[in-house]
Regions:
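Functionally important transmembrane alpha-helices
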Residues: 21-33, 193, 205-261
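Juxtamembrane helix-loop-helix connectors linking adjacent transmembrane helices
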Residues: 31, 35-54, 83-163, 176-177, ...
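Membrane-interface capping segments at transmembrane-helix boundaries
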Residues: 76-84, 270-281
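Small-polar-interrupted transmembrane alpha-helices in polytopic inner-membrane proteins
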Residues: 185-200, 234
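Hydrophobic alpha-helical transmembrane segments
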Residues: 10, 14, 110-117, 153, ...
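Alpha-helical transmembrane segments
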Residues: 7-24, 67, 113-123, 191
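Membrane-interface helix/loop boundary segments of multi-pass membrane proteins
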Residues: 166-191, 218-225
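Alpha-helical transmembrane segments in multi-pass membrane proteins
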Residues: 16-88, 114, 259
């Protein structure tokens, strides 16, 4: 009986995440089959070899958009319920803990600015460290590239808005509060970050996602608002995209810059901690 109860709890916690991944993979597989079986030859033949790279990149973007979107829609009901329940619970907790006010109703612009800056610098530091120490693994974040203003806008919408929303909905919006209710806040932060890392697949992306997942989950816990991890996630992707667009990524791929980014990020997190403690007094 105990095993059945444990199994039902695990299904309740991880069921939506598994469903999201299954739907996402099925849609992606269907699009791959359609592309490889008939669409690739037909489209590339009519467009010409000069546009083949752009068309293949566009198809990759469309594949990501449709597969992730379908996966997100499959867990939409759970996401809405969990977000509302989590926000309500956090508001009740703030009545008992003044420290949460710094990230709640009395959230200051300077606190958000510090948090945003610190998280972006941490994201850049991890990317730079991987590029310096383990170049064979590649950058933790690597985005497809489309030329022109239209390509830039498409990338910005996909990687700075759409994908952060989808991933935060699944891993912070659903998985985190369910883990928290079952196993506590620390386990929820670690568990949601771990599954976020596993979801990203490769070693470099997995480690990067694990570290950033810890930050996003902690920010969600402290702020009690889905907007905060969503904004942080989008801002981190935008920072890496800006380096890619301006072709300055290689300039910063040096240990010195990694140390500068990391040190500044740590200072930012330290100042945020001081703000919370001061508010709690």
């Amino acid at each position: 009986m105990k095993k059945e109860t444990t199994l039902s709890v695990l299904i309740y916690i991880f069921g939506p995440v598994v469903r999201f991944i299954i739907v996402e993979e099925l849609v992606a597989a269907a699009m791959d089959f359609a592309w490889n079986s008939c669409l690739q030859d037909m489209i590339l033949r009519s467009a010409g070899s000069a546009h083949s790279l752009r068309i293949q990149t566009m198809w990759a973007f469309l594949r990501l958009l449709l597969s992730a979107g379908a996966g997100c829609l499959s867990v939409r009901k759970e996401a809405l319920l969990e977000k509302d329940a989590f926000v309500t619970a956090q508001k009740q907790r703030r009545l008992l803990h003044k420290g949460y006010a710094a990230f709640g109703e009395n959230f200051k612009a300077r606190t958000m600015s510090l948090l945003l800056s610190a998280v972006i610098l941490l994201a850049l530091a991890i990317n730079v460290l991987f590029s310096c120490i383990m170049p064979d693994l590649g950058s933790p974040q690597s985005f497809g590239n489309l030329p022109g203003i239209a390509g830039i806008l498409l990338q910005a919408m996909l990687y700075c808005f759409f994908m952060p929303y989808v991933e935060e909905t699944v891993f912070r919006g659903i998985l985190y509060p369910r883990l928290q209710r079952g196993y506590g806040t620390r386990t929820a932060i670690l568990g949601s970050a771990a599954f976020f890392g596993i979801y990203h697949g490769t070693l470099s992306q997995g480690i990067y996602a694990l570290i950033m997942g810890l930050v996003f989950a902690a920010a969600y816990e402290a702020a009690g608002s889905f907007k905060v991890p969503f904004a942080l996630h989008g801002a981190c992707n935008l920072a890496v995209l800006l380096l890619q667009w301006t072709d300055t990524y290689k300039t910063f791929c040096k240990p010195l810059w990694a140390a500068v980014f990391t040190g500044t990020a740590v200072c930012g997190f330290f100042m945020i901690n001081l703000i919370i403690k001061k508010t709690a007094e």
